[in-house]
Regions:
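Proteins enriched for Cys/Gly/acidic motifs involved in redox and nucleic-acid/cofactor modification
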Residues: 1-195, 234, 249, 271-282, ...
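Terminal RNA-binding accessory module
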Residues: 333-432
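Conserved, mostly hydrophobic/aromatic
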Residues: 150, 170, 187, 223, ...
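Extended hydrophobic-aromatic, low-complexity segments
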Residues: 247-248, 261-262, 285-288, 303-305, ...
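Conserved SAM/AdoMet-binding glycine-rich loop
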Residues: 78-84, 89, 94, 179-303, ...
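Glycine-centered loop/turn positions within well-structured domains
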Residues: 111, 148, 193, 258-259, ...
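Short acidic/polar active-site loop segments enriched in Thr and Asp
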Residues: 102, 183, 219, 318, ...
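Active-site proximal loops enriched in glycine and acidic residues that flank catalytic Cys/His/Asp
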Residues: 189, 225, 253-255, 291-295, ...
Length: 432
């Protein structure tokens, strides 16, 4: 056990990661040595930043807390603190059921941890972070919460109403991160397209992205977690006119059947969804679309699922994730629908859908053979340098593998690469 050392463990999404990075900076400013997701944590204090989105995530968070409780009981840890979405939602229950934790914090009051440690929260450092990502890219959170009322989703229950960050504050953070070597920004929010409505009374995402694109040193901007209803179409122009805005959009569509979209309370129709996809590809030639789909939502019939498969085949998404519905207490679906589809049926549908997408992804990847792309290098693994094109977000999308062959490439630098081969997941290339 190392004195004056704190281990931070982050579970869940990139939005949680940003919170952990801000906490780390505050702790370091108060004289602590801080590690993040260490495979061998040895600090005298641990802070677990939890996820409470779906059942599997909650289970992972509970298991991690119990693992550190055991370390505390064995004398390998002095203090254990828990923050994030799980404790935001289940604070009272957790305090009763896991008394070994010294204190639980919600998602928005983790700054109180500093006071409980007898330290100071530095307001003047509110936008500063200790990056846990490679130093050339960062996640940039532009808002919290969500005003949508999707039937299956617990996020609004956990994080509350949509709250946009002031544009000036975001730009200041971008400039600070650029000064520290960041070139690539993953723009994240629970719901990107609503940005600005609460602060400025209108959608301001296109204006914000254009301002970020104009900051010297910003090489790539990539957009995550958009919503299809009332999509701000001026964003198409921003993507066309600014080379550093990646031709990439992560937009969760969930389903295509009008029956399912209505039951999910998505406020969008099948025809509107197809129209939006066509508009993306018409207005931003070459754009790569990532989406997320759901199977097994209450009331999903075989006909609904067949429509979904047909949609995947027709839309040919460049990137796609999918998951099986799990009932979340407090949501509209949990209170109004019976979770009647057997788990084995959900799994069969999920496997079938992902098998379809794997064929499409492999086909699209093989179509890139012979083409040339600008690639940023993330790291070296064994005999290969690992990089990404503008169409690939870290952690979730395919990578480009470049054989070292005695060459020395540098993490965070861009290279022109010709694609020479592809497998079901990744591309292989050579430096031009």
């Amino acid at each position: 056990m190392r004195r004056n050392t704190i281990d931070i463990i982050t579970l869940g999404c990139s939005k949680n990661l940003v919170d952990s990075e801000k906490l780390m900076r505050q702790l370091e400013a108060n004289g602590y040595k801080v590690t993040h997701d260490s495979p061998n944590p040895q600090g005298e204090i641990a802070v677990i930043n939890t996820c409470g989105f779906i059942g599997d995530a909650k289970e992972e968070s509970i298991n991690m807390i119990l693992e550190f409780c055991e370390a505390k009981e064995e004398g390998r840890l002095k203090k254990l603190y828990v923050m994030g979405c799980l404790s935001e939602r289940y604070l009272k229950e957790l305090e009763v059921e896991i008394p070994q934790v010294d204190k639980f914090y919600g998602k928005f009051n983790w700054n109180e941890l500093l006071a409980d440690l007898g330290k100071e929260f530095h307001d003047e450092m509110a936008i500063e972070r200790t990056l846990t990502t490679p130093k050339h890219y960062a996640y940039l959170k532009i808002s919290e919460g969500c005003d949508r009322s999707c039937a299956y989703c617990a996020i609004p229950i956990i994080t509350g109403k949509h709250t946009s960050r002031p544009m000036e504050e975001i730009i200041d953070e971008v400039k600070l991160l650029v000064s520290q070597g960041v070139k690539e920004f993953q723009i994240i929010a629970q719901e990107l397209t609503y940005y600005g409505v609460d602060l400025y009374k209108s959608q301001k995402l296109p204006e914000l992205i254009e301002k970020i694109a104009q900051v010297p040193g910003v090489e790539w901007i990539r957009l995550h977690y958009a919503y299809p209803t009332h999509f701000p179409e001026d964003l198409f122009r921003v993507m066309r006119e600014n080379d550093n805005v990646c031709k990439y959009m992560d937009i969760a569509l969930q389903h295509i059947s009008d029956n399912m979209l209505t039951r999910m309370r998505r406020n969008v129709s099948k025809s509107e969804t197809y129209e939006l996809i066509e508009k993306f590809r018409r207005e931003v030639p070459g754009i790569h679309l990532r989406t997320t789909l759901m199977v097994g939502f209450p009331g999903e019939t075989e006909e609904d699922f067949e429509e979904l498969k047909e949609f995947v085949q027709k839309a040919r998404f460049d990137r796609m994730g999918a998951f099986a519905y799990s009932e979340e207490e407090g949501t509209y679906a949990a209170e109004n629908y019976e979770d009647s589809i057997p788990q084995e049926v959900k799994q069969v549908r999920l496997d079938e859908l992902m098998a379809l997408q794997q064929e499409i992804s492999a086909d699209l990847s093989h179509n890139k053979i012979g083409q040339e792309f600008k690639v940023i290098i993330d790291r070296k693994e064994g005999e290969y340098y690992i990089g990404r094109t503008q169409f690939d977000s870290p952690e979730v999308d395919p990578e480009v593998l470049i054989k070292a062959d005695g060459k020395r490439l540098f993490s965070g630098r861009f290279y022109q690469v010709r694609i020479t081969n592809a497998d079901d997941f990744d591309l292989f290339g050579e430096i031009i």
